[in-house]
Amino acid sequence: MKKIAALIPARGGSKGVPHKNIRKLCGYPLILYSIAACKFCKEIDDIFISTDDREIADIAEKYGAKVPFLRPKKYAGDNSTDYQYLKHFFSKIDVDEVALIRPTTPLRNPVLVGGFIEKYFKTKEQLTSLRSMHELSESPYKFFKINDKGYCEGFFEDYEGIKDYTNLPRQSFPKAYHPNGYIDIIKKETINTGHTYGDKIYPVVTGYVTEIDTLYELKIIENELKISGNLLIDLLQYDGKELIIA
């Protein structure tokens, strides 16, 4: 079985939800859900954290992740890009690719993650990256922006020559997908070309995923966990695994 290192990006300066990456979700720091998913995924053999924040680093290390260095602050601002911290990571750690596991998507099935990793290794020579996504209920062709004059305006000039395309039935448009952070696989080779994902992105489609960018979304996931439970919660509460629980 081929294995891969995981990288969890967790900067300290979240504005929407202060201290988001270590905020408690049903009693556990948010970042722990992603660490746990990696620990319980047999295709992942190492877990790294990219953070500029010492407190986040200490908590991550407590739960068994590696923080061999802190991310430079210049790569951890509101306008910093994934490419910047990924290039920095690959310059420090000698791996060919990483599974990018974003802590803002906490509810993952480790078996599903492993299946996506297996798919990557079967076709990696033909890909520049792998990216998870879920289907949108509405096409971007149904979306509006508000123009400088204060009126609604579609994002596109037309659809197949039709100007008034926003009133077409949604079935008229191709399916659209939203990247959701469940798992991405980033290749050092692609980063070295100056791109994060490249032009041959392999899609893996999940069910709908709630990402945490606001307190409201945090509450949604917390309520979901309280009502339905989750595999990771069960695994975290099981003491037969080598995972330290505070």
What are these model-derived regions, one by one?
Residues 106-199, 204-206:
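Conserved core of the sugar-phosphate nucleotidyltransferase
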Residues 3-8, 31, 46-49:
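Hydrophobic targeting segments
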Residues 54-99, 107-118:
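Short phosphate-binding loop-to-helix
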Residues 80, 174-246:
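Conserved alpha/beta core of the MobA/IspD/sugar-nucleotide pyrophosphorylase nucleotidyltransferase superfamily
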Residues 43-48, 208-209:
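Short active-site oxyanion
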Residues 30-45, 62:
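A short, N-terminal amphipathic alpha-helix
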Residues 1-18:
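N-terminal nucleotide-binding beta1-loop-alpha1 segment
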Residues 23-24, 49, 100:
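Conserved SAM-binding loop
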